[in-house]
């Protein structure tokens, strides 16, 4: 009897174990896309089902018809009160921009999400002060960080996608209760979370690289400590933080490590793909926004408690804030070229006359092959 019960229990246990091991895996099919010399692992692995599910998220919003330009038309700054950023726009273009930002950021709440009803000029709502600063931030990105955003540019919709608060922001994690006890502190490890692809790596891979000014470093290349200028940043602990951050980038862009790195030598820049340089600028772009806009006045002090993290810090950006699972936000949509307000005055594009183009719902777009 025992010989019969034991094998049966063993088989049931084995089936349960296999089920648990496979629960974290994506079900097929998988589609590899070669991005380098064959047989070297230089490829991207895509799941067509997941790619298709992202199509709606990365579809362009409706583009409003461009305002008709008149040389003698008064500007918004000459007509309305308390216009501090977009005052040089025509009244028609200013109204078009306000309509667009309402649809991009607060489609449910409408104009009163930022404005006081009956007194649109008032700065009484903190959201209006935030929106003004966000316009300055977007213009700064489009003017200064073309090495990352290229000539495509960004808009409010790039991050918000119809939500008043972007769905992918980060706060500093709360300190565990046993922090500083006899067992020491875990440095955020062994607490898998979505920010690091559910890995047991440090759960705050952003404070060092996207808020602080630290450079990415891994373990040293020799057995003994290297007498280099940046050697203090090399070691196992720094490697763990680096890999946590790399997991985030991979998940945020929906790509493998070899999208940026060469499989035979991850650290070698000469053998890396062109995307690695774009990512290098992207890291510094996010750091710039976090340091000089999101954690600086007036935003640092104006956000209420319900818009702050567990440690009281404000929301900050990372790679997923814009990319949201796509190797290019909105798969490279040129939405910004139809809205002059998101560019500084000297860089504003001319909007072609006539009806606007129909919104593009991009197909299941994969990252291109590396040349």
Tell me what each language-model feature is.
Residues 2-113, 118-371:
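N-terminal export/targeting leaders of redox proteins
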């Amino acid at each position: 009897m025992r010989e019969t019960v034991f094998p049966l229990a063993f088989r049931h246990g084995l089936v349960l174990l296999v089920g648990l091991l496979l629960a974290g895996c994506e079900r097929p099919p998988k589609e590899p896309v070669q991005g380098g010399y064959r047989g070297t692992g230089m490829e991207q692995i895509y799941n067509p089902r997941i790619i298709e599910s992202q199509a709606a998220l990365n579809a362009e919003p409706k583009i409003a018809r461009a305002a008709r330009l008149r040389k003698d038309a008064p500007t918004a700054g000459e007509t309305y009160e308390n216009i501090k950023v977009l005052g040089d726009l025509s009244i028609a273009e200013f109204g078009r921009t306000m309509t667009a930002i309402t649809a991009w950021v607060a489609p449910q709440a409408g104009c009163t999400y930022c404005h006081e009803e009956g007194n649109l000029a008032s700065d009484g709502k903190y959201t209006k002060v935030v929106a003004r600063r966000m316009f300055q931030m977007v213009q700064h990105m489009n003017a200064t960080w073309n090495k990352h955003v290229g000539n495509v540019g960004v808009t409010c919709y790039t991050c918000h996608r119809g939500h008043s608060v972007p769905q992918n922001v980060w706060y500093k994690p709360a300190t565990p209760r046993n922090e500083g006890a006899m067992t020491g502190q875990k440095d955020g490890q062994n607490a898998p979370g979505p920010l690091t692809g559910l890995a047991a790596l440090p759960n705050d891979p952003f404070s060092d690289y996207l808020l602080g000014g630290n450079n990415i470093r891994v373990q040293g290349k020799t057995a003994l400590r290297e007498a280099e200028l940046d050697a203090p940043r090399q070691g196992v602990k720094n490697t763990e933080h680096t890999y946590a951050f790399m997991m985030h980038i991979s998940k945020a862009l929906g790509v493998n490590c070899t999208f940026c790195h060469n499989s035979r030598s991850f650290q070698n820049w000469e053998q890396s793909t062109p995307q690695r340089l774009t990512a290098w600028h992207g890291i510094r772009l996010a750091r710039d926004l976090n340091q000089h806009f999101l954690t600086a006045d007036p935003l640092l002090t104006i956000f209420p408690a319900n818009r702050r993290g567990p440690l009281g810090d404000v929301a900050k950006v990372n790679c997923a804030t814009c990319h949201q699972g796509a190797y290019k936000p909105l798969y490279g949509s040129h939405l910004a070229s139809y809205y002059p307000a998101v560019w500084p005055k000297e860089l504003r594009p001319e909007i072609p006359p006539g009806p606007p183009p129909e919104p593009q719902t991009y197909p299941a777009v994969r990252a291109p092959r590396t040349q």
